[in-house]
């Protein structure tokens, strides 16, 4: 039985997507990479594809957080401050459970997101 993990969504199978990894054995979060290049204009927001979906137990959810280096160095933040991926989002009919990351550029300069750039961290959590 599979407990939790990541898979690549069908539309991105041939696009060389990396599954999330933890940087070290003590890292809490799994680094999520951008699956595409995109420019986020100063003061604007953009949705970044990851090419990923996540499976988990029914009493779990995946918390999505901005990487602190992006917030500090690039002036980016998640549009909704923190993302929540519910267990039943996996393989849903609308988009196969594709995890999309909404970012807002609160800086004064455009920011370039490149494919493979680590843009967020995902943490597995249990809800009550």
Regions found by a protein language model. Name each.
Residues 1-126:
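DUTPase catalytic domain/fold
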């Amino acid at each position: 039985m599979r407990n939790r993990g990541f898979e690549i969504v069908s539309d991105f199978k041939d696009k060389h997507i990396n599954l999330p990894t933890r940087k070290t054995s003590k890292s809490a979060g799994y680094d999520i990479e951008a699956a595409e290049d995109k420019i986020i204009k100063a003061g604007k927001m953009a949705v970044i594809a990851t090419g990923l979906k996540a499976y988990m137990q029914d009493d779990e959810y995946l918390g999505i957080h901005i990487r602190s280096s992006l917030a500090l160095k690039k002036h980016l933040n998640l549009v909704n401050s923190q993302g929540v991926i519910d267990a039943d989002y996996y393989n849903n009919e609308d988009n196969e459970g594709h995890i999309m990351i909404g970012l807002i550029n609160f800086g004064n300069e455009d920011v370039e997101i490149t494919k493979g750039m680590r843009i967020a961290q995902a943490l597995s959590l249990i809800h009550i």
